[in-house]
Swiss-Prot record:
The keyword Ion transport appears for this protein: no
Family: Belongs to the intron maturase 2 family. MatK subfamily.
Localisation per UniProt entry: Plastid, Chloroplast
Name of the gene this protein is made from: matK
Keywords: Chloroplast, mRNA processing, Plastid, RNA-binding, tRNA processing
Protein name listed in UniProt: Maturase K
Protein's GO biological process: mRNA processing; RNA splicing; tRNA processing
GO molecular function list: RNA binding
Any one annotated GO CC term: chloroplast
Stated role: Usually encoded in the trnK tRNA gene intron. Probably assists in splicing its own and other chloroplast group II introns.
Amino acid sequence: MEEFQRYIELDRSWQHNFFYPLIFQEYIYGFAYDHGLNKSILLENAGDKKYSLLIVKRLITRMYQQNHLILSANHSNQNDFFGHKHKKNLYYQIISEGFAVIVEIPFSLLLISSLGAKEKKIVKSHNLRSIHSIFPFFEDKFLHLNYVLEILIPYPIHLEILVQTLRYWVKDASSLHLLRFFLYEYRNWNSLITTQKSISIFSKRNQRLFLFLYNFHVCEYESIFVFLCNQSSHLRSTSFGALLERIYFYGKLEYLVKVFTFTKDFRVILWLFKDPFLHYVRYRGKSILASKGTSLLMHKWKYYLINFWQCHFSLWSQPRRIYINRLSKHSLDFMDFFSSVRLNSSVVRSQMVENSFLIDNPIKKFDTIVRIIPLVGSLAKAKFCNVLGHPISKSVWTDLLDSDIIDRFGRICRNLSHYYSGSSRKKSLYRIKYILRLSCARTLARKHKSTVRAFLKRLGSEFLEEFFTEEEKVLSLILPRDSSISRGLYRGPFWYLDIFCIHDLANDE
């Protein structure tokens, strides 16, 4: 961010939200290059190692030349890798990456200034960004709540909705026109936002721009939920992967009433936001609204949310995208955990003179359980086991060194143990570790044309140590494994505040 402030003179451009001139600045594409663009894309001459402003200008000019972008029947061959279709996608990739960097610059600086002004209030902002900070909040608050709304956030069907949302913040008509033109011409967008996994998984190409636009859309939607204020302020930063999620949240806390002045119909629900037992959290495209209120109150919330999406965002949300459940009878499927509130009976024997009696005290406990079946499915998809969970060898890794193979398997095992460390029942994780250990052994045995038993006998205990987490190694040195204290530490849930995303097995290679 210091590089942005060093290179960009914002007093003339971004203070009036004029982004279009920045598109023609060469260093912008240098920043975009650092975020994953192909090195050869923006080079005028591969030997010069300089980004060419001429190429950027040519690309924008070609985008506005309709005849150049329309594919004719003569160029419809799918095997023509260097044909017009490849060039068209290449142009869009370059412009989208550059545009995404540009629109993020002013929002990034606003966030920095906001954090600097309120540094004393949010000292632990780095830790609070962790997605694991949601679960301590659940443990603290959900024990006293009754009902929960599980909400699947609708996505905009029409591209113009995204442009109109951004229009309130970006006053530069040229930039908006370029964005609109780009979205309408990029044919893969429709398939991107209509697939089942569109909320959580974005296309590898042009990911930055689409993630920015979706986050901006969600940011506007979540402006009505800033009633969280101080009681759940540590959840401000539990977002799913982009800068924009946290930008305006801090400022909006001080302007609660202004959020609801856009229509008279929503002023009547202000009293709902003042409810101290109403809490909202979100990860990716799923959000949860929990309350201590009655079922009637939650049905009102469902009605208000559907009407809000329709009136303010022109989004049609089907009622089945919002589920009302009672916490005591239903488990939340959230962030790869099954979370529930269950009652534990604590029997106390009381003796008074000659009479004795038993007192049964029900105690509420928040449980988090690993979703073992989807996790095994992920391992099967990554070719560590079959669909039944039986370990198999990772054939694509047999060309690696033995140390690299063991390190890769051990890293995946430690990452999964790290993420699911908060589970109340860790027995299911032992099955995952078993699959990875045996898959690693099968891979090494296949490489050396040996048997698994012979290979494990040769490696011994050193092989298993690669699959231990750092916490397990430390505890094994301090406490004996069979002691009651050690068993409690091994089995007890604990959460980390350095986890910012769910581990993806498919991308670990």
